[in-house]
């Protein structure tokens, strides 16, 4: 009976103490079709050690891709407390993406720590994954007279809720409850639609 709580406590302590040294400057990217590329600043927050930052793009299913988007440079060294920059570049195949709705990809950064000179050291390479939305020209300039967000509906049916997103934009629902400030229902997981 003591083993399970001890393991749970250990897992909690480890999760609180682990955080990435190399982090992107935002939590999501929007790549407008009218832009040739977008830049992302990567920050090495470690006060003493340089890190390698490896970056790549994945499709909506989590498969690593090399087109229609690419990251340059794919690997770079970032010194302690310094910034690096990567460019997400559109390639010719980008014209094959739907022109009437957003497409979702994932931008990934893996930090690679320097080799330790201490014996018997476990090193962990942490990875950050953020959403990257490609937005076609038809969706770039939305009218504030009729915001697209007002078209997203929430319908209550007893204890259940149905969300309808008829728009060409992705909506992320990170939390839900039956009343303001309430707890989410058991088993609720964030979703993107």
Question: Where do the PLM segments sit?
Answer:
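Bacterial N-terminal signal peptides that target proteins for export
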Residues: 1-7
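Beta-sheet-dominated interaction scaffolds and their linkers
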Residues: 20-43, 142-156
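Extracytoplasmic
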Residues: 35-37, 50, 83, 102-104, ...
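Intrinsically disordered, low-complexity Pro/Gly/Ser/Thr-rich segments with frequent PxxP/GP/PP motifs
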Residues: 63-97, 181-193
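Terminal connector regions
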Residues: 93-139
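Buried hydrophobic-core signal for structured, non-transmembrane domains
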Residues: 38-44, 88, 105-110, 160-165
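N-terminal signal peptide c-region/cleavage motif recognized by signal peptidases
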Residues: 12-17
């Amino acid at each position: 009976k003591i083993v399970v709580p001890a393991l749970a406590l250990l897992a909690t302590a480890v999760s609180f103490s682990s955080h990435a040294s190399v982090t992107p400057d935002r939590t999501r990217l929007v790549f407008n079709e009218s832009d040739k590329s977008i830049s992302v600043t990567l920050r090495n927050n470690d006060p003493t050690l340089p890190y390698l930052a490896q970056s790549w793009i994945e499709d909506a299913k989590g498969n690593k891709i090399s087109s229609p988007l690419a990251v340059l440079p794919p690997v770079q060294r970032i010194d302690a407390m310094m910034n690096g920059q990567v460019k997400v570049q559109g390639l010719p195949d980008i014209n094959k993406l739907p022109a009437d709705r957003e497409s979702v990809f994932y931008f990934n950064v893996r930090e690679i720590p320097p080799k330790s000179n201490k014996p018997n050291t476990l090193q962990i390479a942490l990875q950050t994954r953020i959403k990257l939305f490609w937005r076609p020209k038809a969706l770039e300039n939305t009218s504030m007279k009729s915001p697209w967000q007002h078209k997203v509906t929430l319908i209550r049916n007893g204890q259940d809720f149905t969300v309808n997103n008829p728009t060409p934009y992705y909506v992320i629902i990170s939390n839900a409850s039956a009343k303001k400030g309430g707890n989410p229902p058991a088993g609720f997981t964030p979703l993107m639609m």
